[in-house]
Amino acid sequence: MATGDVKGCIRKLEQRLRTLNYPRDVDYSGLIKGDPSAFLPIISYTFTCYSTSIAEILISLGIELATKSDLRFIEAVYKVLRDVFNYKPILTKQQFLQCAFSERKIQIICDIVDCVVKKHKEITGQNKIKNQPVKKIVSAKDQCEVFYPEDMFVQLSVKTEMSTQKKPLVERHTGSEFQLQTKCYKSALLEEAEEEEPTSDCEEDSHLQREMGSPFETAEETPNSEQVELLRKQLAECQEKLQRLDCVEERLQSLETSVKGKIIIDETDWNNLLGRVLLLETERLLQSKKSDLPEFARISEHRTSSRMANEICSNLKTKADIPESHHQSSGYSSVLSADTSPIAIDINYSSLTEESKETTKQRMERITKMMEETSELLKFSNNTS
């Protein structure tokens, strides 16, 4: 190819694109400039969309040409050309991605198209040889029809009725003419039978092909049906998940509306808080009782002393009021043990003080018990926290 013949290269490329049935628009200005964005769509179409067999080969090799950057796409294409087609391009990957070398790029694309078309024809030819249906050999026994006397009788009766309807016509034939007619009739029957035999064979072959179906159709239908079933299952699962999501969203909205303006606390935390509040209240009560104890003792002592003083005064008054003559007239000098003697006064005072001390002791014991219980509760709460 002469250098500078860009138009000739574009004509060759157009011929290759016609063989591929390329449906997209071609950027001729980009081809002339050597812009890689004009060449890459043609390469991707030839490898992915033109032939399903070549696309299957690429998938089996684990090569993906879709959803890639230009550099990775060119790297994958060069790998396919090297491993599958044994073709080494003139330009390097970096040169192909530059805006130059338009003629050589067009030549590379033409070579790629030729390699792909050739490989496609080889694969389809092999598949046709493998999948040719075996012709059924029709024997003479199969072609023979079964004779039923009832059908013959019906046909004869129909012919007799038709002959009765027609007018009788009698002709006289000589022996030689009759023999010639019979020979012509036999030869015509043989020719018709010979013509019907190949047509019947063709009809049987076509019927077998229809019944058996082409292997390509069956091979294509089975994966397609499996894919459709998988897609249906996935759609059903997606619909179920969407319904669950809708239910969850509705429940969340109802919870948000019901819990709006409220504070949610765990049950254990709430119980701990209640226990601590009770402990604090008991501590305050105990402290207040401790502060009130000396005042209470002082008041109780003051009351008891005032009572004793009042009793002593009342006893003295009663003693002064009793006349001495009354004591002398009785004939004995009796001493009022309970009222007049100082020993009795001391006994009464001691009994009163003992009773008040007992009451205060009981109260103090109760308070100490409460203090011990609260201290144990505080220790337990500290250990648990």
From Swiss-Prot:
Cellular location of this protein? Cytoplasm, Cytoskeleton, Microtubule organizing center, Centrosome; Cytoplasm, Cytoskeleton, Microtubule organizing center, Centrosome, Centriole; Cytoplasm, Cytoskeleton, Spindle pole; Midbody
**Protein's GO biological process:** centriole replication; centriole-centriole cohesion; centrosome cycle
InterPro entries assigned to the protein according to its UniProt record, in alphabetical order? CEP44 (IPR033603), CEP44_CC (IPR029157)
The UniProt annotation puts the region (Disordered) at 194-224
Give start-end ranges for the coiled-coil region(s): 224-263, 353-379
Query: What's in the keyword line of the UniProt record?
Result: Coiled coil, Cytoplasm, Cytoskeleton
Q: Name one GO molecular function term.
A: microtubule binding
UniProt biased composition (Acidic residues) = 194-204
Q: Map out region (Binds with microtubules and centrioles) in residue numbers.
A: 11-191
Any matching Pfam family: CEP44
- Any one of the GO CC terms: spindle pole
Known function: Centriole-enriched microtubule-binding protein involved in centriole biogenesis. In collaboration with CEP295 and POC1B, is required for the centriole-to-centrosome conversion by ensuring the formation of bona fide centriole wall. Functions as a linker component that maintains centrosome cohesion. Associates with CROCC and regulates its stability and localization to the centrosome.
Fill in the subunit field for this protein: Binds to centriolar microtubules.
The name under which this protein is listed is Centrosomal protein of 44 kDa
The gene behind this protein is cep44
